[in-house]
């Protein structure tokens, strides 16, 4: 059973990288699939992150994620720049297939793919993303205090945030 890994992590945002660090420190020899296009998750598209502990004056999203990636590398987690395209999570041994057609087996799988926002197709929506158009009320609500805003989509969670 030497080709069966202890743990495979899918996703390379803060949760995926944190899982990889802890798994590596526990000597589980994790494999982390960081994606084929943009590793680092949604924070790679974020400017200043002011609510992450340890950065009193804030930190740029890409800088934070690069620092986390270096920490993952330091603990010798195996980082694969590819997407997982299919999974069979039934049974004791899980099987994952990546975009290159490689299959990896593991006893445990951590899914840390994060979330994705949905654009609604307004003119200039992409251009104004991060400059008035926001995708995270919890993250960005602070910047819009005492202003008139519109909340679109998200079901109950949009109003709760």
PLM features per residue range, with description:
Residues 40-41, 119-120, 159-161:
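Glycine/Thr-rich phosphate-binding loops of Rossmann-like dinucleotide-binding domains
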Residues 100, 109, 113-136:
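Glycine-rich beta-alpha-beta "Rossmann" dinucleotide-binding loop(s) and their flanking helix/strand
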Residues 44-103:
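N-terminal Rossmann-like dinucleotide/flavin-binding domain of flavoprotein oxidoreductases
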Residues 1-7, 66, 74-75, 120, ...:
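Extreme N-terminal leader/targeting segments of oxidoreductases
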Residues 32-45:
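N-terminal glycine-rich anion-binding loops that anchor highly charged ligand groups
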Residues 20-21, 44-45, 121-124:
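Short amphipathic alpha-helical segments
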Residues 2-4, 9-35, 129, 135-161:
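Rossmann-like dinucleotide/flavin-binding elements
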Residues 3-5, 98-108:
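Core beta-strand elements of the Rossmann-like FAD/NAD(P) dinucleotide-binding domain
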């Amino acid at each position: 059973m030497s080709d069966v890994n202890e743990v495979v992590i899918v996703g390379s945002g803060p949760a995926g990288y944190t899982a990889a660090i802890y798994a590596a420190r526990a000597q589980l020899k994790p494999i982390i699939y960081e994606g084929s296009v943009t590793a680092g998750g949604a924070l790679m598209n974020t400017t200043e992150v002011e609510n992450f502990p340890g950065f009193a004056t804030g930190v740029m999203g890409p800088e934070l994620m690069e620092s986390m990636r270096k920490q993952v590398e330091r603990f010798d987690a195996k980082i694969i720049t590819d997407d997982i395209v299919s999974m069979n999570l039934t049974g004791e041994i899980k099987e994952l297939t990546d975009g290159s057609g490689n299959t990896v087996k593991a006893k445990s799988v951590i899914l840390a793919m994060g979330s994705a926002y949905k654009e609604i197709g307004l003119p200039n929506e992409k251009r104004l993303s991060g400059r008035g158009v926001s995708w995270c009320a919890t993250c960005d609500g602070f910047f819009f205090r005492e202003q008139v805003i519109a909340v679109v989509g998200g079901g109950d969670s949009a109003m709760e945030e």
